[in-house]
Amino acid sequence: MDCSSPLSLFHLLLVCTVMVKCCSASDLHYSDALEKSILFFEGQRSGKLPTNQRLTWRGDSGLSDGSSYHVDLVGGYYDAGDNLKFGLPMAFTTTMLAWGIIEFGCLMPEQVENARAALRWSTDYLLKASTATSNSLYVQVGEPNADHRCWERPEDMDTPRNVYKVSTQNPGSDVAAETAAALAAASIVFGDSDSSYSTKLLHTAVKVFEFADQYRGSYSDSLGSVVCPFYCSYSGYNDELLWGASWLHRASQNASYMTYIQSNGHTLGADDDDYSFSWDDKRVGTKVLLSKGFLQDRIEELQLYKVHTDNYICSLIPGTSSFQAQYTPGGLLYKGSASNLQYVTSTAFLLLTYANYLNSSGGHASCGTTTVTAKNLISLAKKQVDYILGQNPAKMSYMVGFGERYPQHVHHRGSSLPSVQVHPNSIPCNAGFQYLYSSPPNPNILVGAILGGPDNRDSFSDDRNNYQQSEPATYINAPLVGALAFFAANPVTE
């Protein structure tokens, strides 16, 4: 929920009262899952680890990142199971962590400080990347092909730590606008707890968005094989420009951003119907975000975004005239074979966020002759979250360290190799592959990691080398944090 809006909180809790039951032994422990979903980010940290680091099998890493280029790029997150820092997915992760805290932070009082710490670990890095060199944004540390040819702990890595940036000559509107969105969203989160930091975030977001908008182009074109096929901007940069402007408007309340949205929306994707929300494609997320302005503030020019949000919602609801989503026999939303759970967590978050907006305005989604209520959206989101946490045909939790049965062979270098505490001597590049292909479980539990997940028949191979199913990623976890906060406060039933 929008924690700055007591009315929104009241409406959402009022709707949930008819759905809440007393907790029993059969209830999933959403509070435990919430805590672990945030803890996961400590396993992805790059840089000098703090004294309160809880995943103690990790150590310091990447302490000279950027130094050979005379910039400080220490910190941030490794994106997944490797030792690379990719700017586009890291910025999206940051935006989604921030959005989750904005909407649902007041429902996780015991975890909100940990959530803010996870967010700040990323924003501190993004601030460095945004301000190190004028008219430039640093968007990557590490050479992907060299990194992937090794199986090394981040504490040992000796592969090239090349640094890549976008600039006025080699633009990257997609990654820059996403970075602006991340910084703007985070500025809302820190508005009450650290006003000077919040101001710095917003000021930087404004500058980065100006850079993204003025020097247009895709970072995939500028950087080529450095980012492709790993994190190509397949959707282009229009979606990020509209997304970034939307977040800057929400964070700053500056009317110029609403003017930008109204003047440029149609050319930047406002009329598109799209059915996936991810680190690459922000169109659906933007529509949900802007629908708030119509539903709660009655900004008529934003009604279009509510209409397209309804189209997205209707595509997910079986029985509606425009239903087109694919679900596995066990009920999991299925979008693709590689890291499918990234789409499940982002969809669950959007369902709950839109339910919040509908509740606060007394609205509903229109699917032809069918009316879809906030309660319907909450129910569908719960099915997806519960599937991830173990209510599925395999009776397996896809969150590492949660529940009685979860994957043991996670595609993650640091987790699969002996920790530096146990094996302080370096394990070289090629020597590490014996651990990739070994049969014992990972020696270090990457608590809270959500993996890529099962296939379209609910089948999962607990195989460390099957990265499509067994690799975690920050952008899989980030949307789930807000969703788990909601269900921890509201263990709703059908």
From Swiss-Prot:
Listed EC numbers: 3.2.1.4
Cystine pairings recorded for this chain: none
Pfam families per the UniProt record, alphabetical: Glyco_hydro_9
Any one GO biological process: cellulose catabolic process
Catalytic residues (positions): D82 (nucleophile), H411, D462, E471
EC category: hydrolase
Catalytic activity: Endohydrolysis of (1->4)-beta-D-glucosidic linkages in cellulose, lichenin and cereal beta-D-glucans
GO molecular function terms listed in the Swiss-Prot or TrEMBL record: cellulase activity
Domain of life: Eukaryota
Chaperone is among the record's keywords: no
N-terminal signal peptide: 1-25
Keywords, ordered alphabetically: Carbohydrate metabolism, Cellulose degradation, Fruit ripening, Glycoprotein, Glycosidase, Hydrolase, Polysaccharide degradation, Signal
Similarity comment: family membership: Belongs to the glycosyl hydrolase 9 (cellulase E) family.
General function of this protein: Involved in ripening fruit process.
Protein name, UniProt field: Endoglucanase 1
Annotated source species: Persea americana
Organism classification: Eukaryota, Viridiplantae, Streptophyta, Embryophyta, Tracheophyta
